[in-house]
């Protein structure tokens, strides 16, 4: 073997070690990224768990959207105390939210179920725009509160609009859906959560 070949052999171990040192951080980064995505439900943000699940709904009191009516009656604002005693689907929405338009027909279908109540939190919106939105896409809300500064959304742990919560008869949050309601997640996640809440025993008076 020539002297040149000896030099190549002598240099190879060092070059291999350098390449290994470069690859280790990359492999570690990819492993952490894969673990992160797995914990987020394989990239599905609607599966991010909420710390509020199983806990009482925030004590939220919000004024009503002026001049909003449903079935000829004025729609009241949001009062968390009113959640107790019936299953409530609470939707956080805004007129400027494009996905909110897409989920509107599904919310209207939910509102037709007399076993539950659909309520809304109108997030950082203009009242006129909000009324026009509901006039165009329909008003599913038996109660709707205005959250002009976004404080209530923070209390509810909202990441962005739309988001939907299921609140049980005991006033505890039973389920949270991040992102718009779709036919798929309605059938596979939201409706089962609603049915589970409806099947739960009614709380005793005073609880």
Model feature map: region roles:
Residues 1-67, 207:
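N-terminal targeting signals for export/organelle localization
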Residues 54, 59, 115-116, 141-142:
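A generic structural signal for alpha->beta connector loops
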Residues 60-88:
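A short beta-strand-turn-helix
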Residues 86-88, 93-96, 160:
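Short pre-active-site segment immediately N-terminal to redox-active cysteine/selenocysteine motifs
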Residues 89-91, 120, 166:
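Hydrophobic beta-strand core positions in alpha/beta domains
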Residues 101-138, 148-154, 188, 207:
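Structural microenvironment flanking redox-active thiols in thiol-disulfide oxidoreductases
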Residues 135-140, 147-198, 206-207:
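Thiol/disulfide oxidoreductase modules built on the thioredoxin-like
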